[in-house]
Structure formats: structure tokens, C-alpha cells
Amino acid sequence: MVLSQRQREELNQAIADYLGTNGYADSLEAFRKEADLSTEAEKKFGGLLEKKWTSVIRLQKKVMELEAKLTEAEKEVIEGAPTKNKRTPGEWIPRPPEKYSLTGHRASITRVIFHPIFGLMVSASEDATIKIWDFETGEYERSLKGHTDSVQDVAFDAQGKLLVSCSADLSIKLWDFQQSYACVKTMHGHDHNVSSVAFVPAGDYVLSASRDRTIKMWEVATGYCVKTYTGHREWVRMVRVHIEGSLFATCSNDHTIRVWLTNSKDCKVELRDHEHTVECIAWAPEAAASAINEAAGADNKKGHHQGPFLASGSRDKTIRIWDVSVGLCLLTLNGHDNWVRGLAFHPGGKYLVSASDDKTIRVWDLRNKRCMKTLYAHQHFCTSIDFHKAHPYVISGSVDQTVKVWECR
């Protein structure tokens, strides 16, 4: 590689600066003599050699990441990934690269969810804000401010008219999502970080889970706490309600998942097989029943397991799928190299997508119990994922402070 005269002079000055600032006086003197440099050190060369050196390493890392992405994209082309036209929507899965990478949050993203009706999505963050985006154009719409600490979870009611959020500031807030986008109620009652919230399908109650080891039910109309469910021995990480509304599930640092009857305070079943904190859960849609039954094994008579079925992701790096009616783990999915932080079923029921601290999103073929696609999604831990029920989109959030929109095809 040939340097121009000017580049050579600048390099010599930078070397001289490096030798001088690091105390190599004899070498500096000899170098100055041989390179014919003046003794006047110019300020602009201060620390230049180190800067160039570190930027080369940074660029090298970036090049390697881009090469990995390129290889992935080429593989897609070579394998002749069927186009949208050749596949049914039930077979569309998220594919790289992302359609949009949305920035604006000033801290880790804790949750991403789609609006049930409009072309909107919502992200919650440790920066204490909730942001609303148009996922079809990638445009930022607005921020909801009111929490004073990390927003841990957000959820819509079935019509998408109300949004509920919970925070490490111990509060739960209800927001009008039709016109004013104002906070219409704030509910207090938990003694520690509120980690998760969910509406019951009818929309008249909200459930919340907390680090205080309890789950509470709140009446939307009044904001009063009407029930407290106890049983978990440690931090309750997530609460998710079954679509029919009669059951809800929670998972905890105590390594268990509990399924509760909504209208009583009774725990229907406790699921224990994970070897570490259970971070996330997701109810399987009815469409997933046949794939899960097939995966459950040869001894399983066709349609033997009636469900409902629940998926769970843990810090033990595994994903498990359970038949809640009998309290049985039907299958275990292995592949992530770190904590599993988010789960979402494909609305068609054939696939499950997961987000992990290994920075990837994985697409699991349920019927064959295998990972069929890995997306190197973020620069840091992936914390949350959602699959749109009607449009071919997946969204993910990360500790890298970005929200990404992935198109399925």
C-alpha cells in the first residue's frame, strides 16, 4: 500500500506523538532524526495513532457483522426462499434484513406490542416513556409520559381503546388510546416493581404481576384492586390471560409457571420443569393444536392433548410447551445460547418465534421441534417480540435501544 507524501508526514507526526506521550524519549529522538521531523509537536496529532488503531478494530468488527448478514441474505437467495406468492400466509416468517430500525428511546426497550386494529405499535422502555410508532411507514407518532421509572410492560384491551402500562415506580396506568392519549387512571397497591400487565378479554379488569410476589386484579371502571393472588415464592415476571378469559398464567423467578382460575383465587396447576427463572409465557392459538399434538410424539393419539397449550421461555435457555389441562410438558426446544426473553406464536399456529439475550430471534417449526431460522437481530440482548395477528409483521425490542420491524414472507 503506497502512502502519499502528506499521509507519510502525518503518520510520522502521529508516531512521534505516540513515542513522546508514552515516554520513549530515546526512540523519539532517533525517529525524529531519521524522519527529519521538527521538534514542534502539532496538537492535531495528539492521540491520533491510538484513535486510528481503535477505529480500525471497530470497523473490522462492523465488516464481520455485515459479512455475516450478507452470507445470510445470499443463503436466502440461493435456497430460493419461496416468494410471498408461492407460500400461504400461514407459512410466512420474518426474514432479514429488518424493514425498519426505529430509534428514539434513551434506554433499553422492555416491551413491544402491536395495536390490535390500527397500523400502530407501542414500545416501552427503561427511559420511563412509552412510544407509539406507525409500523407500516416506520414513523414515530408520539410519546406517553407519566411514569417516573422504567416502564416494564404494556397491553391493549381487545378494541385497542385503552392501553395499560406498569412500571418500576410501583404504579399501573391506564391511557386513553382513542383521542387524548392522556393518562386516565393511576393505580397503586403493589409493594415493589410491577413487572407485567394484561387485560382480561372483556376489558373490564386488568391483571398485574409484581416483584412483591403477588398478582392483583383491578377494576378498570373504578381503579380499585378487587383480588390478590398469592402462591409464587419469588418475583412474578409475567402475566398472560387465555383468550377465553377463564384462565391466566404467570411465571416467576421461583422457576415455576402457575395457571389460575380468573374468577376465583385458586391456582389450577403449577408447572415445574424449568431449572432457572421463567422470563416469559405465551398462550398458543387454537390453530397450533395440531402441530403441538404431532410434535408431542408417536405415543400421542391424534388430537389426544386438548390443551389449552402454553409456551414458556426461561433463563435455562430452553422453551417448553405445556398442556395446561394435565400439567404436562409436551416438548422442549433447545437452541438459544442465553436467556429466552420473549415468545410469540405465529397466528397460523405452525411456528413460534422467540427473542433471547443471545441477540437473536429464532423461528421454531413446532411440528418438527426444530429451529428453522435464526435472525441476528440486534447489537445487544433481545428483550421482547410480537407477531401481528393479521398483517405479515414481527417487531422486536432490545437493550440496544432500538425497535425493529421485520416483514414476513
Swiss-Prot record:
<dbReference type="InterPro" id="IPR020472">
    <property type="entry name" value="G-protein_beta_WD-40_rep"/>
</dbReference>
<dbReference type="InterPro" id="IPR037190">
    <property type="entry name" value="LIS1_N"/>
</dbReference>
<dbReference type="InterPro" id="IPR017252">
    <property type="entry name" value="Dynein_regulator_LIS1"/>
</dbReference>
<comment type="similarity">
    <text>Belongs to the WD repeat LIS1/nudF family.</text>
</comment>
<dbReference type="InterPro" id="IPR006594">
    <property type="entry name" value="LisH"/>
</dbReference>
<feature type="coiled-coil region">
    <location>
        <begin position="54"/>
        <end position="81"/>
    </location>
</feature>
<dbReference type="InterPro" id="IPR001680">
    <property type="entry name" value="WD40_rpt"/>
</dbReference>
<dbReference type="GO" id="GO:0005875">
    <property type="term" value="C:microtubule associated complex"/>
</dbReference>
<dbReference type="GO" id="GO:0051301">
    <property type="term" value="P:cell division"/>
</dbReference>
<dbReference type="GO" id="GO:0005737">
    <property type="term" value="C:cytoplasm"/>
</dbReference>
<feature type="repeat" description="WD 2">
    <location>
        <begin position="146"/>
        <end position="185"/>
    </location>
</feature>
<keyword id="KW-0813">Transport</keyword>
<dbReference type="Pfam" id="PF00400">
    <property type="entry name" value="WD40"/>
</dbReference>
<keyword id="KW-0131">Cell cycle</keyword>
<feature type="repeat" description="WD 7">
    <location>
        <begin position="377"/>
        <end position="409"/>
    </location>
</feature>
<dbReference type="InterPro" id="IPR050349">
    <property type="entry name" value="WD_LIS1/nudF_dynein_reg"/>
</dbReference>
<dbReference type="Pfam" id="PF24951">
    <property type="entry name" value="LisH_PAC1"/>
</dbReference>
<keyword id="KW-0493">Microtubule</keyword>
<feature type="repeat" description="WD 3">
    <location>
        <begin position="189"/>
        <end position="228"/>
    </location>
</feature>
<feature type="domain" description="LisH">
    <location>
        <begin position="7"/>
        <end position="39"/>
    </location>
</feature>
<protein>
    <recommendedName>
        <fullName>Lissencephaly-1 homolog</fullName>
    </recommendedName>
</protein>
<feature type="repeat" description="WD 5">
    <location>
        <begin position="273"/>
        <end position="332"/>
    </location>
</feature>
<keyword id="KW-0206">Cytoskeleton</keyword>
<feature type="repeat" description="WD 1">
    <location>
        <begin position="104"/>
        <end position="145"/>
    </location>
</feature>
<keyword id="KW-0677">Repeat</keyword>
<keyword id="KW-0853">WD repeat</keyword>
<dbReference type="GO" id="GO:0005874">
    <property type="term" value="C:microtubule"/>
</dbReference>
<dbReference type="GO" id="GO:0070840">
    <property type="term" value="F:dynein complex binding"/>
</dbReference>
<feature type="repeat" description="WD 4">
    <location>
        <begin position="231"/>
        <end position="270"/>
    </location>
</feature>
<keyword id="KW-0132">Cell division</keyword>
<dbReference type="InterPro" id="IPR036322">
    <property type="entry name" value="WD40_repeat_dom_sf"/>
</dbReference>
<dbReference type="GO" id="GO:0005813">
    <property type="term" value="C:centrosome"/>
</dbReference>
<dbReference type="InterPro" id="IPR019775">
    <property type="entry name" value="WD40_repeat_CS"/>
</dbReference>
<keyword id="KW-0963">Cytoplasm</keyword>
<dbReference type="InterPro" id="IPR056795">
    <property type="entry name" value="PAC1-like_LisH-like_dom"/>
</dbReference>
<keyword id="KW-0175">Coiled coil</keyword>
<dbReference type="GO" id="GO:0051012">
    <property type="term" value="P:microtubule sliding"/>
</dbReference>
<feature type="repeat" description="WD 6">
    <location>
        <begin position="335"/>
        <end position="374"/>
    </location>
</feature>
<keyword id="KW-0498">Mitosis</keyword>
<dbReference type="InterPro" id="IPR015943">
    <property type="entry name" value="WD40/YVTN_repeat-like_dom_sf"/>
</dbReference>
<dbReference type="GO" id="GO:0000132">
    <property type="term" value="P:establishment of mitotic spindle orientation"/>
</dbReference>
<comment type="function">
    <text>Positively regulates the activity of the minus-end directed microtubule motor protein dynein. May enhance dynein-mediated microtubule sliding by targeting dynein to the microtubule plus end. Required for several dynein- and microtubule-dependent processes.</text>
</comment>
